């Protein structure tokens, strides 16, 4: 069953003015419940604008957005409930922190859902533990934390609402490799534990290959492709023409295949590449890329 359906969705900035710009153009897609979807596209492709439609931050200029089969904008007075169903983490979410303690910041969303004090407490402690925040630190000011820790607190605040869909727009932007791996690992663990649908907007093809099951490709405001990650990245030439690149592992294996080595060129994850290289070595192949 699809948890998200976009039906001919378009969005135009500054419509009717000299600055009018089509940011999203006639997008049709259905995303199944429980999928982990990577959203990719060049800068200005419309990917961030697209995902802002999913929790009603933006209303389509035309077309409809369905969540769990319900037309999000059929009754504007009911839009608020979709913001609890679809959690959105912006780029640099640490700039959205505002409460005096970590606990209060993470509790803000669940409290506004009308949950009991006991339920809010359970959710805060569970979400912060999931992102690696020690319970002893919950009464600290979030502004005393490092950039990476602040980001984890901000993500925990959305996770604590337990949305059916969690949308993250470049959640690792500006982090060092260790910080990036930590946050992505926590998002994957959340996905495994809750079964929620995840949409991860990222410019890193390696991250999409390693964490997502499907990829949604935006190009100049239009949906170019939505399919399994392996199938999307097999279109290496088309992706390159959009100004994107496939994971480095894929480029290496494409060169190996071109040189006549018996490899599958459509390899995108390091662990799969290691397995193939070991098999080649076992067969006595001498690799020169």
Predicted regions and their residues:
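A short, flexible loop at the N-terminus of ABC-type nucleotide-binding domains that lies
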Residues: 1-3, 12-26, 76-78
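ABC ATPase NBD Q-loop/coupling interface
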Residues: 15, 64-81
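Helix-to-loop junction immediately C-terminal to a conserved catalytic motif
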Residues: 55
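Conserved ABC ATPase "signature" region
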Residues: 118-136
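Conserved ABC ATPase signature
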Residues: 141-145, 149
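Conserved catalytic motifs of ABC-family nucleotide-binding domains
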Residues: 162
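Catalytic Walker B motif of ABC-type/P-loop ATPase nucleotide-binding domains
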Residues: 166-169
């Amino acid at each position: 069953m699809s948890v998200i359906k976009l039906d001919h969705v378009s969005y135009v900035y500054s419509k009717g003015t000299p600055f009018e710009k089509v940011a999203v153009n006639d997008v049709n897609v259905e995303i199944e419940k429980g999928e982990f979807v990577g959203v990719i596209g060049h800068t200005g492709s419309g990917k961030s604008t697209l995902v802002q439609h999913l929790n009603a931050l933006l209303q389509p200029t035309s077309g409809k957005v369905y969540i769990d089969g319900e037309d999000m904008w059929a009754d504007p007075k009911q839009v608020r409930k979709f913001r609890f169903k679809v959690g959105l983490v912006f780029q640099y979410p640490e700039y959205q922190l505002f409460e005096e303690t970590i606990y209060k910041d993470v509790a803000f969303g669940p409290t506004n859902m009308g949950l009991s004090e006991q339920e809010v407490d359970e959710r805060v402690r569970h979400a912060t533990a999931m992102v690696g925040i020690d319970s002893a630190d919950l009464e600290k000011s979030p502004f005393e934390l490092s950039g990476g820790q602040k980001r984890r607190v901000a993500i925990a605040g959305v996770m604590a609402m337990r949305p059916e869909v969690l949308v993250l727009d470049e959640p690792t932007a500006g982090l060092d490799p260790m910080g990036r791996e930590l946050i992505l690992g926590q998002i994957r663990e959340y996905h495994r534990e809750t079964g929620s649908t995840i949409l991860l907007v990222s410019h890193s093809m390696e991250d999409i290959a390693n964490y997502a099951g499907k990829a949604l490709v935006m190009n100049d405001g239009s949906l170019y492709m939505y399919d399994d990650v392996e199938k999307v990245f097999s279109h290496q030439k088309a992706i390159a023409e959009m100004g994107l690149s496939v994971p480095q592992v894929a480029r290496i294996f494409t060169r190996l295949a071109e040189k006549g080595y018996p490899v599958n060129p459509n390899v995108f994850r390091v662990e799969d590449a290691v397995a193939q290289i070991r098999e080649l070595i076992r067969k006595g192949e001498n690799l020169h890329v």
